[in-house]
Amino acid sequence: MASMISSSAVTTVSRASRGQSAAVAPFGGLKSMTGFPVKKVNTDITSITSNGGRVKCMQVWPPIGKKKFETLSYLPPLTRDQLLKEVEYLLRKGWVPCLEFELEKGFVYREHNKSPGYYDGRYWTMWKLPMFGTTDASQVLKELDEVVAAYPQAFVRIIGFDNVRQVQCISFIAHTPESY
């Protein structure tokens, strides 16, 4: 029995020493503010915000006669070399190229719904199948030439589809009709 009492006494002593090492010093009160400099800060943000110097160089997109398309629509039409570079980019990213065309309205419009959304009331027709396994950008441009030959008055766009995440990652207009 004596051995049991001595072992419990040792345990009690070790518990007390652990509790004492984690003790925190008592609260000593607030420090005096006389040693700190006092600076009044103006919280009115209207006094510091101004873009008056840049207003002269800003322009507004002219809404008449210039419809908005997909990505890069604010740029002039892409040249053949620029299209090739865009397609090479989407192939480097591992995306699947796909061509779509629209015969009537290649721009954003809302026919059946007034709220904005990704599709904005338009669905494009896919040209053939997505080009799975394509590694050469010139193959995509040959397909683009076929679409334009078959439907010269169509809007044609190239999209890059990520088949792993199952999302469309890039989309841009590759051809606009001559009449537009």
Curated annotation (Swiss-Prot):
Transit peptide (first-last residue): 1-56
Domain of life: Eukaryota
Compartments where found: Plastid, Chloroplast
Annotated InterPro entries: RuBisCO_ssu, RuBisCO_ssu_dom, RuBisCO_ssu_N, RuBisCO_ssu_sf
Pfam families: RbcS, RuBisCO_small
Function: RuBisCO catalyzes two reactions: the carboxylation of D-ribulose 1,5-bisphosphate, the primary event in carbon dioxide fixation, as well as the oxidative fragmentation of the pentose substrate. Both reactions occur simultaneously and in competition at the same active site. Although the small subunit is not catalytic it is essential for maximal activity.
Further comment: The basic functional RuBisCO is composed of a large chain homodimer in a 'head-to-tail' conformation. In form I RuBisCO this homodimer is arranged in a barrel-like tetramer with the small subunits forming a tetrameric 'cap' on each end of the 'barrel'.
Protein name according to UniProt: Ribulose bisphosphate carboxylase small subunit, chloroplastic 2
Lineage: Eukaryota, Viridiplantae, Streptophyta, Embryophyta, Tracheophyta
